[in-house]
UniProtKB/Swiss-Prot annotation:
Keywords carried by this UniProt record: Isomerase, tRNA processing
Protein name listed in UniProt: tRNA pseudouridine synthase D
Main function: Responsible for synthesis of pseudouridine from uracil-13 in transfer RNAs.
EC number(s) reported in the record: 5.4.99.27
Protein family membership: Belongs to the pseudouridine synthase TruD family.
Residue ranges of every copy of the TRUD domain listed in the record: 155-303
InterPro entries assigned to the protein according to its UniProt record, in alphabetical order: PsdUridine_synth_cat_dom_sf, PsdUridine_synth_TruD, PsdUridine_synth_TruD_CS, PsdUridine_synth_TruD_insert, TruD_catalytic, TruD_insert_sf, TruD_pseudoU_synthase
Catalytic reaction equation(s): uridine(13) in tRNA = pseudouridine(13) in tRNA
Binding locations of substrate: 27, 129, 329
Organism: Proteus mirabilis (strain HI4320)
Length: 350
């Protein structure tokens, strides 16, 4: 079970092939925190455009330039190295003057703006990311154009991307070994990576099973429904299923699946039976998450890209733009358009 399974597609397996990220400029990401910065406070906020640099490396260099410990530099999320990305970095500098960032030099990095903030910027503290991707050498333009229209209307499965599971799925493989007592994992960061891979794999499996059983867009009795744009959810009761189905089709609410851990899954009746039955093969991973006292959370199974648009640069090249909420993967959109090799997919950022 440690190898990454082939997940089902909402719009059918793509027939077209193509290339992503021929150059870093073919993959652009702009982070959106979703709130206005204070303009004052003990934290210096630095907006950086970077190419060919990973996030942690830039944070370390900014901390060194500012004369602070690396642990006092933070960011909201990791961005891909092999891309052009814009994001905020946060430097804790109480009582210190704003550094002269015009003197900061790092190949591939450009300081766009600086300000101050009262609170530390923590992982996950962002609204989402704006993506602009260029897909080249598309073998079946008609198919891709049709799929773009379908995705704009219906969305895509909200799968965790392959990068969530480590290079060649190694984090998931190690999670299985840990769960079956083949290895002991002491390092905190590895425990976190392996648990994340385990829970993401269970989520992906349940989403794929709903597609295979043709209940992906059908609200089941007992489904946990998430309000659009919110983290709160409620259970779909039998007497209200017709009304809830209508709200789902209007994208007002979303069907969810669990990232299993300790505590109840949150579903009831038919939906609970479906989830528990289909997690049977993942019992060891689920037990591991419970043992490590990770809370069960839920996530929408469908991802509807916002502000989606595209235009053809030439006969076989399309430029595609959209916004995704925090925690969603551009992989999920691209995999419904063209067949991607593992190397391409592993290099797509969250």
């Amino acid at each position: 079970m440690s190898d990454l399974p082939e997940l089902h597609w909402l719009h059918g397996k793509p027939t077209a092939t193509g290339r992503l990220k021929s150059t870093p400029e073919d993959f652009k990401v702009s982070e959106d925190l979703g709130f206005t910065l204070d303009g004052e406070g003990e934290h210096v906020m630095v907006r950086v455009r970077k190419t060919g640099c990973n996030t942690a490396f830039v944070a370390e260099k900014l901390a060194k330039f500012a004369g602070i410990h690396p642990r006092d530099a933070s960011y909201a999320g990791l961005k891909d190295r092999n891309a052009v990305t814009e994001q905020w970095f946060c430097l804790r500098m109480p009582g210190k003057e704003m550094p002269d960032f015009s003197q900061f030099t790092l190949e591939g990095c450009e300081i766009l703006t600086t300000t101050r903030q009262q609170r530390k910027l923590r992982i996950g503290t962002l609204k989402g990311n704006h993506f602009t991707l260029v897909l080249r050498d598309i073998s079946d333009v008609t198919s891709v154009e049709t799929r773009l229209v379908e995705i704009q209307k219906q969305g895509v499965p909200n799968y965790f991307g392959v990068q969530r599971f480590g290079r060649n799925g190694d984090n998931l493989r190690q999670a299985w070994r840990w769960a079956t007592n083949e290895i002991r994992v002491k390092e905190r960061s590895k425990r976190s990576f392996y648990l994340s891979a385990a829970r993401s794999a269970m989520f992906n499996h349940l989403v794929s099973q709903r597609l295979e059983r043709h209940i992906y867009t059908q609200v089941l009795c007992g489904d946990a429904m998430q309000l659009h744009g919110k983290r709160s959810w409620f259970v779909a009761e039998g007497a209200e299923l017709a009304q809830i189905q209508t709200r789902y089709e209007e994208h007002d609410i979303h069907i969810t699946a669990p990232l299993p851990g300790k505590g109840d899954l949150g579903t009831q009746a038919q939906a609970l039976i479906f989830e528990t039955d289909n997690l049977a093969d993942y019992e060891a991973l689920w037990s591991l998450a419970q043992q490590e006292r990770v809370d069960t959370t839920r996530r929408a199974i469908n991802l509807l890209p916002e502000n989606m648009s595209w235009h053809w640069l030439d006969d076989t090249t399309v430029s595609l733009s959209f916004f995704l909420p925090a925690g969603s993967f551009a992989t999920s959109v691209v995999r419904e358009l063209i067949l991607l090799g593992n190397i391409d997919a592993e290099n797509i950022s969250e």
